[in-house]
Regions:
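NAD-dependent ADP-ribosyltransferases
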Residues: 1-261
Length: 261
């Protein structure tokens, strides 16, 4: 991964109020929230009522009707006058019970150059993270993802992962998306409104072809993966007080002290 002109290891940051939660993560216990969790927090700073949903916009729709149905079967298509429709939100059955794990991704977006050979976290990112807790863990994205993929394979699950794109969520989706039978219904979990951009999020979700992984009366799922071989846990004030030093290393060298005073 390139950060400014430097080759940098892919790193993830997880913030929590519970240090034990972060210790469990590094030991291989990944507590995944149900995907509807943040919709329940819509009245708090952390909440997002549109997380995992399509907000259908009619702002740029020029026709008088909304047409729904398969294009190859015109007789099955229906027309609905737009006079009777306002913007609405679309999801799918069970879209609130998918195991989801989110972190922040180390990138240029949340870093600034302090000197030629040191970087600092931007204040916007730190302020955002302070809303989520007092402790953080930093660890290798490559190792974490590989351990999660091993878990997915061992348990015959499906999954999707990647960085979140930040968009104007109220104009991102148009009515035509409902007629796209080839769209991946899970893509919506990887787009969030621009107002959340300082979270700089990276996510992974798990999908089962059988029974739901999170039952109706449950609220989280625990994925038991191999322990992480490299990580650092600290107080979030370190992100503000300390710098990331850049130095040349041999391919075989691993520097565990990412943050230095």
């Amino acid at each position: 991964m390139k950060v400014f002109q430097y080759e940098f290891p892919d790193m993830l940051i997880k913030v929590s109020n519970n240090r034990k939660y972060l210790e469990d993560l590094c030991a291989g216990k990944v507590y995944m929230n149900e995907s509807g969790y943040f919709r329940k927090l819509e009245d708090t700073y952390r909440g997002d009522k549109f997380d995992g949903k399509c907000v259908i916009s009619f702002e740029n729709h020029t026709g008088e009707f909304m047409e729904l149905g398969p294009e190859e079967s015109p007789e099955e298509r229906i027309k609905i006058p737009l006079d009777f429709i306002q913007n609405f939100t679309v999801g799918f059955k069970g879209d609130n019970k998918i195991p989801l794990y989110c972190c922040s991704q180390l990138s240029e977006h949340i870093l600034r150059k302090e000197t030629e050979f040191s970087l600092k976290f931007k204040e916007e990112f730190i302020s955002e993270m302070e809303q989520f807790g007092s402790y953080y863990a930093i660890f290798s994205k490559v190792e974490f993802l590989q351990n999660m993929l091993d878990y997915i394979d061992d348990n015959q699950l499906g999954g999707k992962w990647g960085a979140v794109s930040y968009v104007d969520i109220h104009s991102e989706y148009h009515i035509e998306i409902l007629n796209d039978e080839n769209r991946n219904q899970y893509n919506v979990f990887f787009k969030k409104d621009l107002s959340y951009q300082w979270q700089n999020e990276w996510r992974i979700i798990l999908v089962s072809s059988g029974a739901p992984l999170i039952g109706e009366n449950d609220h989280h799922f625990v994925a038991s993966i191999k322990p992480l071989s490299w990580f650092h846990i600290g107080h979030i004030r370190e992100l503000r007080d300390n710098s990331i030093e850049i130095k040349e290393v041999d391919d075989s060298e691993v520097d565990g002290n990412v943050l230095r005073q």
